[in-house]
Amino acid sequence: MLAGATAHAAELKAVDAPPPSALELSDISGRVHRLSDYRGRVVLVNFWATWCEPCREEMPSLDRLQKQLGTRSFVVLAVNVDEPEARIAKFLSAMPLDFPVLLDAGSKLTRAWKVRVLPASFVISPDGRARYTVTGELDWSAPAVVERIAKLLPGQ
C-alpha cells in the first residue's frame, strides 16, 4: 500500500545509478511509451495518484517545468498508480497537462521502482542514468530546481 507524502520540504537528492527497471506503459490514449524512446533527453518520471493531495499540488509546477524546458530535450512522464482511466480522465479535464500521463494498472512499475510514497520522482539524464530522486512534493518550477535540471540538458 502506498502513502501520500506529508507536507515536508522535499528536495532533489543526487544519485548516479541506472533506472530501477525498464519503463514501458501506455498513456491514456493507448500510445505506448518506453523510457528508451526518450534516450538523449532528460526525463522526469513522476509517480502520482489523483487521491494524493501532494501529487495534485505539484502537478502545476511539473507542467510549468515542461513548458519552460521544452519538449526537444526534456519530458515529464507522469505515471498514475493503479487508478481507473475514468478517474484520471476526469482529473485531466479539470487540470490539462502538457506531458504524457501513463497508466500503471496493477502497480507493477511502481513496485519495480520501489516507490513507497507518493509523489515520487526520478530525473533521468540523457545517458539513461538516474541523477536525482525526490520523495514528496516539490516546486519543480523553483529557480534552483530548474537550474539543476537544466544543467543535465544536452549541450549544457
Report the location of each language-model feature.
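N-terminal signal peptide c-region/cleavage motif recognized by signal peptidases
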Residues: 4-6
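Structural microenvironment flanking redox-active thiols in thiol-disulfide oxidoreductases
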Residues: 56-95, 105-112
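Hydrophobic beta-strand core positions in alpha/beta domains
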Residues: 44-46, 76-78, 122-123
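Thiol/disulfide oxidoreductase modules built on the thioredoxin-like
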Residues: 90-98, 104-151
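Short active-site neighborhood of thiol/selenol oxidoreductases, capturing the structured segment around
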Residues: 36-53
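Short loop/turn microsegments at loop-to-beta-strand junctions
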Residues: 20-21, 43, 118-120
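Structural signature of beta-strand start/N-cap positions in the alpha/beta core
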Residues: 41-43, 73-75, 100
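N-terminal "domain-start" segment that seeds a small globular fold
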Residues: 8-35
